[in-house]
Amino acid sequence: PPAQTLALTAATPAAAAAAPAAPGQTAAAAPAAPKLTITGSFASDCAEERIPRLILSPEQHAAGAFDALWREAGGTIDGHVLAASAPAAAEIFHSADSQPLHMVLRRINKSSDNLMARLVFLALGAEHAGAPGSKVKARAALDVWLAERGFSFPELMVDNGSGLSRDTRIAAASLGELLAWAYHQPWMPELMASMAIMGVDGTLTKRMQSEPIAGRAHMKSGTVRDASCIAGYVLDQDGRRWVVVALVNARPGQRLAAWHGHAVHHALLRWLMDGAKLP
């Protein structure tokens, strides 16, 4: 049935007036809390599903999270949080390390978490050229890494590090070359374990469940409007490991439904499992 329009206001405190400015500084009023409006329809038998979305700016998200956690711990805050450069004399009073990279990548690749993927990309830039991380720094770090290992992918364009950019480009042959190289690296087991398993878990849970390939393909999938892709490793019934990359895009001026791309993927994978026989 049609869903009534819902309007949700983020629980981030907003100031009605600006905080006093120090001499020589300009203070701005905190922005009003953003509103998320949801419209559309859904089937009456839809199961519960969680869809993570970040509707706040990074500054609002950080300020709101700090405010909530601080008050939860019994603290109080007077005034408002403003987005500005940290004073030169500021000192870090606490820092926290993330989970190990292989655990982070497992969360990203199994469920196709684009937000986390982008954060890892930005962290790459910060490690390469110092904080704060940026897309420009991250791209430079990636270029250096590829060049040091002898890779040359002229067509490569990584926009924001996630799967939600229509500017990102790579050829299937280039991605296959990279995956073949990665298979012989000492960290290969961690990389493969981070990928969804066909018919078993992650984004591939419901695909090819009752077919021989179920449980034998570790792959990263990606689907947006007019594009459907898979890339990873397949173990055939003769014990051979294959690198498989299939990037399916709509022709100019045409549309591509996700299931159209899936049909191509599944046909290719069945062919491999049948022995990869040429006509």
Language-model regions, residue ranges each:
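Small-residue-rich helix-loop
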Residues: 121-279
